[in-house]
Amino acid sequence: MCIRDSSRTDGPTSIILSRQNLDSFVVKELDQLKMGGYFVSKKNDATVNLIATGSEVGLALEAEKLLTTDGINCNVVSVPCLETLLSNKNRYNEIFSSKTTNIVIECGHPNSWYKHTQNVIGIDCFGESGKGKDLMDHFGFTPEKITNKIKQMI
């Protein structure tokens, strides 16, 4: 997908990487990547969609485990490209369903998500320096802190 998108001629492309060690997961159906968003974990009885991008997907999966132990069933959605997702209305409507509480986890500025849901956990200030793990804790991006914020939203 990165190679395909980097060869676009109709607009800019950025590939954003992390310096942190991240858990990886396998995308079973590569065609789902082309839709801009896909379910990493899907339950028939989910009441919450945890929507994340990039490194936040692993955090969403950890929060899902904690919420499940509290009886809150969640789907986890990866959105590698919001622009592509917006062009796939059926997939967009499946992800941002009115049947679930949709919560976005975004370690960057949350503004681009507010037109899709008011439930956004993001960072609206910058300029901190330090180790990645310490900064994630400082900004509230640990599985436990994210889980507590999600519980307050639902």
Where is each model-derived feature located?
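Thiamine diphosphate
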Residues: S7-I154
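Short, small-residue-biased leader/transition segments that mark boundaries at the very start
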Residues: M1-I3
